[in-house]
Amino acid sequence: MVRSAIGVVVGVVAWVVGFWILAILLAQLWPDYAVHGRQWTREGVFTFTAPMACCNLVAWLLAEIGAGWVAGRIARRGGAVWVLAGLLGVYLAVVHFALYWSRFPWWYDLGVVIPAVPAGTTTPTLYHHGKRGQ
């Protein structure tokens, strides 16, 4: 139980850190992305172009997969991965569907929220540990 809780907490941290690392890397490779990223972090204004926003969607997806993997490795139980995926899904749904729907393009809101739970549970750790009963 303790390992599961630690796995979920570390998974959330991995999710945030993973996205920011990918975003910083993208900003280093694409200077115009960096300009829009700074505008988002300073003013909360979403000015990313469609290709930039699609790169954000890929970064969120990769961060969710990585977070699920980290949580599964630490917890050694598939249940922790599902809890993490559920928490991320609920958090993103509240942020993108209730609080900030009008701040983002509709397709971006859907692109962030819909794959959150499936992406977080696609980690091989979930299936390997679940089959062995560990």
How would you label these PLM feature ranges?
Residues 1-134:
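Juxtamembrane/disordered regions of integral membrane proteins
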